[in-house]
Each structure stands twice: as C-alpha cells, then as structure tokens.
C-alpha cells in the first residue's frame, strides 16, 4: 500500500529529475506466514526498467527494510533516460510475491523530452 492506496499513485518525472521515496515497513504478517517464511515481514523497493544506480540509497535491491523501520530511496533519473512507463515494486528475494499479492506496486512514468523518438 502506498499513501494508503492500492495500487499506489502514478509518479511522473522528467529525465534529469530526482525521485525520493520513503518506504516505511508496516507489514502485518501473520504468525503462520512467519513460520513458513521467517523473512516475510522484510521488504525493499526496486524501480523496474530504470537506468539508475543500484548503489547506496538508489535502486539497491540488496537492502532489507525490517518491520517497523524506514528507508529513503533516491532515484536520480539520468538526463538521457528513455521515456516510458516503469513500475516500482518490492524486490526482496523470498518475499516479493507476498508483497505484490498485497498490492505493493505503483507506476512511474518518465516523460519524453523534445528529442525523444519513442513517440509517446
């Protein structure tokens, strides 16, 4: 759930923009699920299809945000990033399907610039 809605809102950005997202992990995982998968209450974010750095607080899918913790993600969209529709979703191996089934996804639209040839 993003900003109390599922799916999350559409994020619209231009090439060269910075997208900042604060992920607050409020996963409420039942005890039965935790027995099956002890990591089920951990999560993270991935900007699928983006051409951004995987380092630091960028698109680092190795980060695991524990239940009750927060993480700020900073996505610096390159000036030459192609336009198109991307999506942001959890990407923590072993827990992704549970989060996606709960609606944790949102669209990210990178707008075309005047030189874009994608004809959007």
Predicted regions and their residues:
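Histidine-centered copper-binding motifs that mark active-site loops
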Residues: 1-120
């Amino acid at each position: 759930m993003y900003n109390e809605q599922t799916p999350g809102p559409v994020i619209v950005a231009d090439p060269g923009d910075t997208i900042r997202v604060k992920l607050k992990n409020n996963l409420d995982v039942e005890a039965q699920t935790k027995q099956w998968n002890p990591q089920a209450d951990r999560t993270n974010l991935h900007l699928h299809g983006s051409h951004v750095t995987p380092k630091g607080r960028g698109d680092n899918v190795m980060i695991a945000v524990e239940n009750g913790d927060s993480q700020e993600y900073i996505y610096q969209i390159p000036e030459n990033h192609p336009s198109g529709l991307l999506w942001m979703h959890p990407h923590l191996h072993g827990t992704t399907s549970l989060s996606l089934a709960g609606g944790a996804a949102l669209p990210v639209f990178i707008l075309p610039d005047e030189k874009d040839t994608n004809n959007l």
